Each structure stands twice: as structure tokens, then as C-alpha cells.
């Protein structure tokens, strides 16, 4: 007789005091160049592929977790949230209201704009990113126009595209179209009729979100030939209605199936803080564009940290919204269970304004997910500091410090301590069991859903047109079985229970955003790509709950490591708790403002 299967304790009976944190130990080869090509041939081979994927899954406990374990919980195929208490000190925006009206309402939640603080006379001020309200002030006061700023952007894009090495932030850029958009905005200002505070604001769109008339390729070489773009994605249409100007389609890790940003098709986006290092991904181009100063904000997608990871590595803000808070209609992946469209921005204030414009659930999500009312924090409320002082921050210390270099966790801890000493917040120790099971369930969930979307094209002869690292991922994803998928959804229910229990004690959960700072780009990866699951696991270590459970999360820059590379602190919130995250993130941003550094590759488009 065989050995009886492992059985997990029912989730309600798990003794948290007996839980011991185990640092993950991922086993997979690091491959570039010819070795990557050979590995892909083996993975796709009918003779060797099944054996190789079986070994990889066995070595990384995937088979044991999903095939050899009895999991007593029911599957959770979509995030399921209990009713949430109303957030304090917020302004309701209304899910179905016009985005222009919502942005106008959100504007009243921000401190009054003082040009003297943003445009000081005399000595050169410390480095600050220009904010959306700085551009609005410059346009309204006649300092500059959207057309002038557009020319600075065009010059910056051309300059960095011709650098050695080049910095390919965009996969589609049309200077004439940008000039046309800017001219229309300039006329509105000349006539005294700007549409909103976002009129004339330049924003980039990740290449897996439709922005008419540009194609959506997902940074492949072929997707625009099999899928046409007839109109804007919903989130883009909402921004366009506010007067936003779109600078083009931003580079990304091909089809979002990686978190470094490597892309041999269009060139790998480079980190503005150190051009020999990755931006992180998959929203690599959006992060590089915002970090380098070429736009105030960008829209990316986040299915496995793809907004938060590059935002952290590039030293900017990345907000991942609750699953179902933003309408994914018009994105290449608009029917998965882990992905959302969300903003990257130079400041929390700008993230708040862009979020106010794009938020709003689609009708089906309103029926199934029952989102809490859409709101933003009232940062000028007399109670704002008191609300901040009442915040309880959850911290799983052993997990928090499981990073490649203690510079990362110590810097994040310093930011939390500064927040607590400034406002009176409390840090509470929490325990989150089964983090490795969570990682496995996420890999199987996003992998199976991606493979389901791409397999028809794969089988129709497009296999060799994918990059090698995408083909590696698809070969692994295609080996997952229905049993693996259902078992992963059972794990999803367990992990949701643990987080719901933690949120009975705390308001937000704090972690470093990534387990490493920006990794170096191997020269050998530029032509054929790279497969490095160990580095990817470090980058994704803390972000997965946001996707598997659909929870909102935000990353805020809080300092740099010894090499001068940005470090991000992540805050994970309750379902639909974006307002609370934005409030706490705004306070942390202000406390750490002097620690931000001008990227070595930076273009001042407002004061060029």
C-alpha cells in the first residue's frame, strides 16, 4: 500500500502560535543566450518536456502541495470579501459618476496648492518630481503650454532612444499625434476652458491596454496582427474624457509573463537610477517613463506585482487597486482572476487623482464582488492626523526581514518607526501561515489563466514568435492540470481566511515591496532574453497576496541601499480600502521626501 496523503488541518483549526516561518528555496536554472534556447527546446520537446516540467514541479514542492495533499476547504475561484466597515475621513466619489466630476471632488481632498513651495525663488531646491498640479498651475498662469511640454517630451524620447545603450521605454510613439493632442489642449487653455485638472497632463499606457488609435501588442511582435484596437479601454476612455494626453504605448515584459522587464523584441527598458539595471516588470516602460520625468503618471496592469515591483525599483508610487475596483474591459487580459489596471505616479497625490479618474467597477463585478463605495481620503480634514494616529500596522517580522540585504528591511522598518513616532500609529505583530502555498497557488492561477488565453495562438503557429522566456513559462503553465488549478483555489480560500483574521487586528499590513533592489541586466540577455526564477521569486516575495486575494496595495519609496538603488515599502489594505492606503502612503511619502534622489537619467519636461 502507498503512503497516505498529507492532509492540511482545516483552516479554522490552525494554531498560529505553532506556525514557523520557512524561507522559500526555489530551484530553477538561470539561463540566457544559447543555454536558454536549448532549455526551451527541451521544455517544448514531446520526449523531454514532460519529464523536465515534472522534475521542476517536484523540486519546488508544487506536486506535493497540489497533487499529494488533501485540502479540506472549498475552492474560491474569485476573491470573496466579507462586508467591510466604512473607512474614516473619506469623501465618497460615486462609482457611476462622470470621471471629470470625480477628479474635481478628489481635488478638494488635497492640501491647498502653494506655488511658492513648488517654484521657490533663490537657491536651487532639493530634488522633487513635478506634480500634476504643478503642470496645471504652469498652464493656467502662462508659464508654459501643453504644446511646449510635448516638444520637450519628444526631444527626451528621441534622446534616450539614441543613447548607447538605448533606453527603450515605448514600443509605439507618434510625435505628430502627440503634437495634435497637445495643440487641442493648448487651445482649451487659451480659451479658458480646460476640461479638468488632468487636462494637458501626459500619461503613458502599458502596451497591454487599448489606447486608440495605437495598436496593442503586449510587447510581442505579432499580437496587433491578430487583434485590432477599435476603441479605448474603459480606463483610458475615462482619462481621455478628463483631457489627458497620451504619449504612446509603454514597453513591458512580453505579455506580462515576467517581472524583470526583459524584452528582446523592442529592447529592455532600463532603470533611470542605474541604466545597467532592470526596471522590474512587467510594467517596465510605465515605471521608467514616470521615474525619468517624461510623464507624471502611467497606467499599468498588475497580475503578479507588475505595477508595484517596477515602481519600487524605480523609486516611484505604484497603487494596485482591489480586484474589480477598475474596469479591465479593453485590456489584453480582461477576464482573469488576479489582474487589475492601476496607476504608477511620481507622487501619492498624483496617484490619487489618476485613481479617481479611472476607478469604477464593471456591472458584472458590482453583482459578484459587491464593492464598497468608491472614496478617497480627505487629507485636509481636521481629523486626518487623529485618523492616522489610530492606524494599526501589521508586521510579520520574520517574513519582513527575509530579504537579500538587510538594507532593504531596515530602511522599511525605519520608515514605519518614523510614521509611528510622528503620528502615534501602532505596529502589531501578525502571523500569516502558508506563504509558500500562496506563492504556488498564485503561479498556477495566473499561469493557467495565461495559458488558456494564449494557447490558441500557440497552437496556431505563433509558438516561435514568442520570446524564449515566454515560451519557457508557457511550457510550464501548460503542464498544470485541472487538479492543480482546483487545489490552488482551495489554497486561495485558506490564504483569504488568514488575511481576514489579520485584518481583525490591524488596518494595513506592511512589508518591503521587493526582496531585492534592481538587479543587473546580463549583457547576454539582451538578444535572446533571460530566465531567472530565483531573482523573480525575490522580486515577487511580498506582492502575491495583492493578486491571489485581490487586495489593494501601494508601494512608497522610503530610501536607497548602499548602491543608491531605490527601496520601496509596501502597504496591503483591506478589500476596497484604497482610501486608507493612500492616506498612510501620503504620510510616509512626506516623511521620507528628503530621501528621494534625482535619477541619473532624468528629463525636466516642465522646466527644460
Swiss-Prot record:
Regulation: Inhibited by methyl arachidonyl fluorophosphonate (MAFP).
GO BP: lipid catabolic process; N-acylethanolamine metabolic process
Subcellular compartments: Endoplasmic reticulum membrane; Cell membrane
SUPFAM superfamilies the record matches: Amidase signature (AS) enzymes
Binding residues for substrate: 303-306
Subunit-structure text: Forms homodimers.
Protein name per UniProt: Fatty acid amide hydrolase
Pfam families reported in the protein's UniProt record: Amidase (PF01425)
Enzyme category, top tier: hydrolase
Annotated organism of origin: Oryza sativa subsp. indica (Rice)
Function per UniProt: Catalyzes the hydrolysis of bioactive endogenous fatty acid amides to their corresponding acids. The hydrolysis of endogenous amidated lipids terminates their participation as lipid mediators in various signaling systems. Converts a wide range of N-acylethanolamines (NAEs) to their corresponding free fatty acids and ethanolamine.
PANTHER family: FATTY ACID AMIDE HYDROLASE (PTHR11895:SF156), TRANSAMIDASE (PTHR11895)
Enzyme nomenclature, EC number: 3.5.1.-
Catalytic activity: N-(9Z,12Z-octadecadienoyl)-ethanolamine + H2O = ethanolamine + (9Z,12Z)-octadecadienoate; N-hexadecanoylethanolamine + H2O = ethanolamine + hexadecanoate; N-dodecanoylethanolamine + H2O = dodecanoate + ethanolamine
Active site, renumbered: 206 (charge relay system), 282 (charge relay system), 306 (acyl-ester intermediate)
The family this protein is said to belong to: Belongs to the amidase family.
GO cellular component: endoplasmic reticulum membrane; plasma membrane
First-listed, main subcellular location of the protein, grouped into a coarse class: endoplasmic reticulum
UniProt keyword list: Cell membrane, Endoplasmic reticulum, Hydrolase, Lipid degradation, Lipid metabolism, Membrane
Superkingdom assignment: Eukaryota
Keyword Oxidoreductase assigned: no
GO molecular function, one term: N-(long-chain-acyl)ethanolamine deacylase activity
Amino acid at each position: 500500500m502507498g503512503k497516505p496523503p498529507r492532509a492540511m488541518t482545516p483552516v479554522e483549526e490552525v494554531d498560529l502560535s505553532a506556525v514557523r516561518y520557512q524561507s522559500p528555496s526555489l530551484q530553477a536554472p538561470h539561463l540566457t543566450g544559447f543555454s536558454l534556447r536549448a532549455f526551451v527546446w527541451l521544455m517544448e520537446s514531446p520526449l523531454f518536456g514532460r519529464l523536465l516540467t515534472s522534475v521542476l514541479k517536484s523540486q519546488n514542492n508544487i506536486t506535493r502541495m497540489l497533487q499529494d495533499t488533501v485540502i479540506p476547504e472549498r475552492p474560491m475561484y474569485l476573491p470573496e470579501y466579507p462586508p467591510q466597515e466604512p473607512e474614516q475621513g473619506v469623501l465618497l466619489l460615486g462609482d457611476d459618476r462622470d470621471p471629470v466630476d470625480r477628479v474635481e471632488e478628489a481635488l478638494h481632498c488635497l492640501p491647498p496648492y502653494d506655488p511658492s513651495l513648488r517654484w521657490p525663488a533663490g537657491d536651487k531646491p532639493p530634488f522633487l518630481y513635478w506634480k500634476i498640479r504643478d503642470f496645471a498651475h504652469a498652464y493656467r498662469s502662462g508659464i508654459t503650454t501643453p504644446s511646449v511640454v510635448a516638444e520637450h517630451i519628444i526631444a527626451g524620447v528621441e534622446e534616450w532612444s539614441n543613447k548607447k545603450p538605448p533606453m527603450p521605454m515605448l514600443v509605439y510613439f507618434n510625435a505628430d499625434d502627440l503634437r495634435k493632442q497637445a495643440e487641442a489642449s493648448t487651445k482649451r487653455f487659451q480659451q479658458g476652458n480646460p476640461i479638468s485638472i488632468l487636462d494637458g497632463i501626459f500619461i503613458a499606457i502599458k502596451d497591454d491596454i487599448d489606447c486608440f488609435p495605437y495598436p496593442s501588442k503586449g510587447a510581442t511582435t505579432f499580437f496587433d496582427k491578430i487583434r485590432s484596437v477599435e476603441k479605448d479601454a474603459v480606463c483610458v476612455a475615462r482619462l481621455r474624457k478628463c483631457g489627458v494626453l497620451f504619449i504612446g504605448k509603454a514597453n513591458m515584459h512580453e505579455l506580462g509573463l515576467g517581472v524583470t522587464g526583459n524584452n528582446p523584441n523592442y529592447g529592455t527598458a532600463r532603470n533611470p537610477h542605474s541604466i545597467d539595471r532592470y526596471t522590474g516588470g512587467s510594467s517596465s516602460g510605465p515605471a521608467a517613463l514616470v521615474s525619468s520625468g517624461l510623464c507624471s503618471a502611467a497606467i499599468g496592469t498588475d497580475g503578479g506585482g507588475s505595477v508595484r515591483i517596477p515602481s519600487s525599483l524605480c523609486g516611484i508610487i505604484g497603487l494596485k487597486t482591489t480586484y474589480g475596483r477598475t474596469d479591465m474591459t479593453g485590456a489584453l487580459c480582461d477576464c482573469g482572476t488576479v489582474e487589475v489596471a492601476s496607476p504608477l505616479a511620481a507622487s501619492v497625490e498624483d496617484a490619487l487623482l489618476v485613481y479617481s479618474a479611472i476607478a469604477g467597477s464593471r456591472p458584472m463585478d458590482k453583482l459578484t464582488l459587491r464593492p464598497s463605495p468608491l472614496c478617497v481620503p480627505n487629507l485636509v480634514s481636521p481629523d486626518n492626523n487623529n485618523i492616522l494616529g489610530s492606524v494599526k500596522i501589521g508586521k510579520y517580522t520574520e517574513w519582513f526581514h527575509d530579504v537579500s540585504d538587510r538594507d532593504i528591511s531596515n530602511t522599511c522598518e525605519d520608515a514605519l518607526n518614523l510614521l509611528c513616532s510622528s503620528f502615534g500609529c501602532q505596529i502589531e505583530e501578525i502571523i500569516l501561515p502558508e506563504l509558500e502555498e500562496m506563492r504556488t497557488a498564485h503561479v498556477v492561477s495566473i499561469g493557467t489563466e495565461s495559458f488558456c488565453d494564449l494557447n490558441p495562438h500557440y497552437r496556431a503557429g505563433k509558438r516561435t514568435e514568442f520570446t524564449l522566456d515566454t515560451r519557457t513559462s508557457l511550457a510550464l503553465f501548460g503542464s498544470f492540470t485541472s487538479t492543480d488549478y482546483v487545489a490552488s483555489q482551495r489554497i486561495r480560500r485558506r490564504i483569504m481566511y488568514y488575511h481576514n483574521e489579520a485584518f481583525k487586528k490591524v488596518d494595513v499590513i506592511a512589508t518591503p515591496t521587493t526582496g531585492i533592489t534592481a538587479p543587473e541586466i546580463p549583457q547576454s540577455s539582451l538578444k535572446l532574453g533571460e530566465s531567472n526564477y530565483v531573482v523573480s521569486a525575490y522580486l515577487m516575495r511580498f506582492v502575491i497576496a495583492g493578486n491571489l486575494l485581490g487586495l489593494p496595495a501601494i508601494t512608497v519609496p522610503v530610501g536607497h541601499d548602499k548602491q543608491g538603488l531605490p527601496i520601496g515599502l509596501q502597504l496591503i489594505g483591506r478589500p476596497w480600502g484604497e482610501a486608507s492606503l493612500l492616506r498612510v502612503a501620503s504620510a510616509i511619502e512626506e516623511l521620507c521626501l528628503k530621501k528621494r534622489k534625482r535619477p541619473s537619467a532624468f528629463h525636466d519636461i516642465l522646466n527644460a
